[in-house]
């Protein structure tokens, strides 16, 4: 049986990951405003945002299986979402370079009155970089729409020195976690 769902995200990375495991989907970007409340633990923040996105789309498609997801980076108890612009991306990378940090991704699946949420954390260490290297990476534009200002699946892979945990989680959607959640809705990838 082919798994089919609505993706409450415009993220090209999440689309690529779903395609990679053979999930059929339709993109229905959510109008939900992501919250970046520093008082919330990151595990709670990402699942709340993921659920908010899925529930927002459910208003337009109440009988569908809907996937919402949210990713943040945490370093020294500070939450890093997407940068506000090139200067912010450079600042984030300057703080993260040479350091271990944690990437949290929350997943929400919603179908009619049922919903399930879960999160996954992955530790990542970026290599040490010179200010010129950071500026060149930012100038290429890749980090401008990524939590933490780097794309592990793109040129940013050259910035990653080590990873401890789920690679696809850092990209923006833990595939092993998603497969487990889909099974709870009687949808099997394999």
Swiss-Prot record:
**Molecular function GO terms recorded:** dTTP diphosphatase activity; nucleoside triphosphate diphosphatase activity; UTP diphosphatase activity
E.C. number(s) listed in UniProt: 3.6.1.9
Catalytic activity, as annotated: dTTP + H2O = dTMP + diphosphate + H(+); UTP + H2O = UMP + diphosphate + H(+)
GO CC annotation: cytoplasm
Query: What CDD domains does the entry give?
Result: Maf
The record's active-site residues are 70 (proton acceptor)
- A Pfam family this protein belongs to? Maf
- State the Gene Ontology BP annotations: nucleotide metabolic process
Cofactors, names only: a divalent metal cation
Site feature location: Important for substrate specificity: 13, 71, 153
Record's keyword terms, sorted: Cytoplasm, Hydrolase, Nucleotide metabolism
List the subcellular locations. Answer: Cytoplasm
Task: Write out the similarity annotation.
Answer: Belongs to the Maf family. YhdE subfamily.
Functional note? Nucleoside triphosphate pyrophosphatase that hydrolyzes dTTP and UTP. May have a dual role in cell division arrest and in preventing the incorporation of modified nucleotides into cellular nucleic acids.
Q: Which NCBIfam families match?
A: maf
The protein in question is named dTTP/UTP pyrophosphatase
Which species is this UniProt entry from? Gloeobacter violaceus (strain ATCC 29082 / PCC 7421)
